């Protein structure tokens, strides 16, 4: 431990103690808050089913930075490189298209065995796994509909895919001793004015009920559903809207997924957390950064990321909120993207844990909004960076931008040699 770091740490402890904050307790709590990293940043959502196929479903990864992972071994190696440079507990979020098989597997036939390598890798790296059915980039999703499709056979295919995905998710939870959160997102919608908005939603409701009909151990598997405002090619109508899934999660008591980029640009999910928690048992968050639309830019340590973290901490939602990331930027080093976004999420959580929330609540209850605003702003100047640096030190990860040197070395030695 360097003398400079130790001195900064001791001063920070004193400064935070003066406002009633135990920084050691804040770090202990941070160690109980895993962030689920998304595998698809590493290969631009290509997956291993058909890596050369085009990405569909109204989503888009832009850029062509060299070094993209081309197979599971490369993706796992890249993830390990990123995770070494991110302090504290982590999980990995997988999509169904990241299965491994020597022969083609239809999506409605995926099985736990196709993800055995991921489970063994997660065990070796002390990670939990989360999961997602992949209802996009497939011939049977080409017309823009999956679980709400008017064709019974196509709709059944996607129902069976989601059913099979739930069994994979339960396998993750059983093997790893921590529940897998399986999130259902579908791209279903229409480009232009839609006359019958009801029938697709009726079909989706019935399809989802069939998907979750098999009872699974909640210690192994958690169902979540995710809404979206629009996608490319589905600008006018999205079957799985916010109102649809809020109603579904409430009535079926599933988890609700709130994605930072899936609402109108003037809406923020930080304001939705406390409202949704009144009605649903658990929330899954997809922390992202929408720029004018659901662009999935790398997460920053900005006001909204901080507000999301603060909502979790202020309302003691540690056991009810699952924190996941969802961005994919192909214009920069993909490993750096993981590191920047995940470290920023963890920094936001730490800053929230260092807030004198009890004192702020008292001021708010007393109607002293002047003092509330003053303390909130002064809090921003307290030396949280010194606490972060100590946290990184304890987890044997670089505290500042030194991590970039490791990424550059890995890029030179490994990424640059990929075709």
Curated annotation (Swiss-Prot):
Its cofactor is Mn(2+). GO terms for biological process: L-lyxose metabolic process; rhamnose catabolic process. Mn(2+) binds at residues 262, 294, 296. The keyword tRNA processing does not apply. It comes from the Bacteria. Keywords: Cytoplasm, Isomerase, Manganese, Metal-binding, Rhamnose metabolism. GO terms for cellular component: cytoplasm. It catalyses: L-rhamnopyranose = L-rhamnulose. Its EC number is 5.3.1.14. Pathway: Carbohydrate degradation; L-rhamnose degradation; glycerone phosphate from L-rhamnose: step 1/3. Disulfide bonds: none annotated. Binds 1 Mn(2+) ion per subunit. It is found in: Cytoplasm. GO terms for molecular function: L-rhamnose isomerase activity; manganese ion binding. InterPro entries: L-rhamnose_isomerase, Rhamnose_isomerase, Xyl_isomerase-like_sf. The keyword Phosphoprotein does not apply. Transmembrane segments: none annotated. Its main location: cytoplasm. SUPFAM superfamilies: Xylose isomerase-like. Belongs to the rhamnose isomerase family. Catalyzes the interconversion of L-rhamnose and L-rhamnulose. Homotetramer. This is L-rhamnose isomerase. The lineage of its organism: Bacteria, Pseudomonadati, Pseudomonadota, Gammaproteobacteria, Enterobacterales. The gene is rhaA.
